[in-house]
Amino acid sequence: MAAPLRRDTLPDNGSYGVCRDGRVFFIDDEARATTWLHPRTGQPVNSGHMIRSDLPSGWEEGFTKEGASFFIDHNQRTTTFIHPVTGQISTENSDFRLQDQPGGRMLKQPSSTISEASTTVTTSTVDSTSGSKGSRSSGRVHSFGKRDHAIKRNPSVPVVVRGWLYKQDSSGMRLWKRKWFVLADFCLFYYKDSREESVLGSIPLPSYTIAPVGPEDHISRKYAFKAEHTGMRTYYFSADTQEDMNGWVRAMNQAALMQTHTVKRDECGHPDHVNVSEKLKKQAVPQTNHINSYVIPKPEVIQSDGLPEDKREGFVGEVEIQVTPREMEQARGKSPASRVVEVEVLAPGSTPPSRVASRAPSRAVSTPPVVQRNGTPIEQNGMPGCQRGATPSAQTPVQVQRRSTLEQVENWVKVQKEERHGLVSTESTVPRRTPPIHPKYGTMDKYQSLPKTSRQSPPAPHHQLPSEYKYSHDRLNHFQKIHGHTKRPTTHDNTVWQLFEWQQRQQFRHGSPSAPVYTPAPDYSTAVSSTRNNSDVSRSVSVPPTLADIPPPGPPGARLMSPRRPHTPAERVTVRPLEDRPIVEVPPSNSPHRLRSYKSATIERRSMPPSAYITHTVSAPSLHGKTADDTYMHLKKDLEYLDLKVSGTEALKGRPAKPVKVAESDVDVTLSRLCEQDKILQELEFRLSGLKDDKDKLESVLDVSHQQMEQYKDQPSHTDKIAYQQRLLQEDLVHIRADISRVSTEMERAWDDYSRMEQSVEQLRDVLQTQMTLCTSPQEKNQLKRELWRIEDVMTGLSSTKETFKITVDSVKNPERKLVPSVIESTVPSRCMTPSAAEVRSPQRSLTSSPLPLPLDNEDLRNRHPVPNWEEDDAPPRPPLPLLYDEDTPPVVPPLPKETSVIRHTSVRGLKRQSDERKRDRESSYSNGDYRLELRSYLSEPELPVSAHGADHVDPGYLTLQRRGLSGSSSRINQYGVASCSLRRDLELSTMERPKSALERLCSGEPQLEQQSQPQRVRMSVEEQLERMKRHQRALVRERKRNLSQGERHHSRASTRPVNSDPGSALFVEPYRPASDEWLTVRARPVMELELEPLDFEFDITRELSTPQKVWIPQRLIDDESDEDLSPEEKETRSRTVAKIKTLLSKSSMRSSEQMDFSDLDLALQQQERIMSVPRALATEASIKRRQVTAKAMSEG
């Protein structure tokens, strides 16, 4: 875009200046001309256009307002669509209808237009009726500086500094990402890594302010600094060390001031050299009309008068102005009209011999000099003038020159008015896209410098416009759409119109619609008097500036900023009364932020009362056709009118504000708080959704990185890079997840508050409805009805978001998928409740796990002591329990729910059989068809070797005993011996109550969690029970035959109580538990291998066949139904049923004793089974009948 400035290579008679937008132009003092090309290199400097390698020297590429590319020849001062080397039109222009600008006179309007903000004049454009093509480049404006739209770096420009920096993202979570930064060509480029392959973005640094972060930035990162610019985005960076940060800040500040590292300052602080260099390599600003000077073609009659023949076209020159970098910084960052310049157009046949001297008052003899050769810039109305590089003054102090500046300018203006009295074309003090007074004398060259009317000069929706101008372009577009005129009349002065336009331009000097605006005082006495008789020919800003480009005159103290709103339409001007216009003296400042804060503090809009001034709209088109005197009178009348309207301003200021009652009732307060809580929930939900999106993106990127790690695992160089990226992403992911959790917690609290408030609102509504029902007064009813309507309106409005909040909160509290298995609590409470690791790892084996995971300590085996055995009794053996209870406090067991259990236990044989079945069920993990848990014992490996071999997977800390199936003989332990182990009880659970037995747990239903986790228990049917009883009876008969044949020796041996085949049932614990921290000793009883299934009770055939004795039925086995609730008919029915059952049982017992034949035991067994099935069927039938009678009685009652 630009070549290096190389000020040291400028000729002795050459100097340079800098425009408002940073463009550099060069001044030839001998020829009194300006040019965009460097005198030695022949290349433009910081011109705003692109310098392509395939273009000849002095050529650049620009873009029209519609986006079509064209080429600028600074040598011949022409533009064309045809490439100068290839002779072809660019393929990018295939979508445009190109039309070359004619070479006619100014009266003939070409099809091209002038870009207002970028000061572009092009030779061709798209048809003005093509609205679709006119919006092609609008999307490119907003994406400037990112990736494809970044500035292209010039490899030939030396790099000032490069290295790693952290940069904060501009959107989303504002994460800090590490990037490789390169500072070159006054622009900061950043890349993905140090290879600098493809640029990720670029930041043009001129006019930026680089400084460490402050508390207002809310940046807690160490070694952080920022690049700030008015009306543009603030960039935040972070270095690794303090030294790196200082180096970057120093280098970036020099680039922001467009200084090289060779700039030296003297002891007084003034520079010896001001090296104003290019701002960027590719600014992408379509500033097409970057011309050297405006050329006035030869008319029919022209008087050269001292000018050579080749100078008859009359290049408009520049007046030499010398400034210091301090003044340049003020003018660039602060002064709105610091570089507003104007072009002086000479009329044909009227150029006097002293014309050159009048254009350059510093060289004129008849006029006082504006500034001396080594002076300071002119300041009119407190505004610095056009600036360019110079040497510091050593003759007079700066303060003395500044005091004489205004007087010198006024004298010079008077001289110019006297010298140019009667001339056709004069100069104006406010340059702004106004047409020439007599366009018939000038022809339009392709390399145009003068602007056309405002209608012909719309802002170009250019290719890639920097953000510092996009707001002004949008506003000017809107301004031109409002005014439907094609061109303004050219027979008047247009001074006030230019003042208005100048105000609009100054408002956007930094691209911000809310930037301070310098508006002249409403009483333009000085301004109008000094410019009333001057007709202006303004120019495009892209023309190199001249001396006469000065801001509107007026006393410095009367210049103030308009407190306009940022989006006030462009054709409106806010005029305030004289008494409310404070005098603002703006002192020169080196910092742009000091000046801005000083101004904003002086005329803060919020400090004024609402009625302190009245906004009066002045329509710009209404000024058309009026002379300067008419316009001045019109403004004066408006001001007088406003003075009358705001005569009571002081009274209004002193008047106290009227108190406001926010809430009329408690319903209003509650509803307002509920709405506030809804707003809080909405904000939290928005933050949560953004965090979740960021988390999902990071996780997706991490998934890809994991796949790449697997793919490149054989390449260490790739894996190291991927691992580094993963660490950065994982760090960001941790922060995001932490934020998600924090926001979720806040949202849960807010949701609880919301629910509470909603409940209070519902209660209020109920109370109001009750009051309205009881109220008799119509007025009170109406008031209550209105309150109810308010509640209904608010609740209905909040119902749309309520479900969304509820879903969001529930998703955090109760996620849909639960991948982690929950730990199942032990079934039997014990003093060692800690679940083992294997139970958590393998939940499918939980059905066979023991509820008593007792850790084994090998050292405690030394402390063995014998445990006394239980005494044998005649009663059926008790099922083995996990622990032994004290006989003094037997467990209280609730009754069983089934009546069939009562019938089954009414005989001694039935009780014995059921006892045997229960014992076998426990051994085979079944109990009456119900699933049961087997005991898990912690035994050492030498004690149970068979159990260790039989287990599929046993953790090293303990061994699980094998589960015995229907045929339990295969799982018996083929080993005799005594094994004892000491078990340590948990100290924390020493004070718990004694655990309940299996029957208690079965009937009480307390362990709800385990019952839910286990599969549903299904009780065995009657047929299954009968089949099981038959198998058991056959086994008993075979055993009886064998016992009778073997004799008394074997009978006596077999009559002893057999030992349970399950080793777990052979472990008995001593009943005494003196202390919680003592050791419990478990001793294994000797186990003997039997060929047949063991017998659980003594066999005596005479006892079996005799009349059964009366057996006491425990209370827990009787149906718990009180007689108080039964009617007399039910009691009678029940007594008859019980008598019938007893009779049947006694008869069946007597028949069996009479009819049994010992010769045929098998036949007797079958007969006995048939007899046993009869009472069972009768009992079932009796139960059904009893329930039917009960239901009938209840229905009749």
From Swiss-Prot:
Chief location of this protein within or outside the cell: other
SUPFAM superfamilies membership: PH domain-like, WW domain
Listed Basic and acidic residues bias regions: 568-577, 913-924
Keywords carried by this UniProt record: Cell junction, Coiled coil, Cytoplasm, Cytoskeleton, Repeat
Coiled coil feature spans: 678-799, 1016-1044
An annotated GO BP: regulation of heart contraction
Biased amino acid composition, Basic residues: 1032-1043
Subcellular locations according to the entry: Cell junction, Adherens junction; Cytoplasm, Cytoskeleton, Microtubule organizing center, Centrosome
Statement: the UniProt record of this protein carries the keyword Isomerase: no
Region: Disordered, residue numbers: 98-148, 348-384, 423-467, 508-577, 830-928, 1032-1064
Identification of the protein by name: Pleckstrin homology domain-containing family A member 7
Gene (name only): plekha7
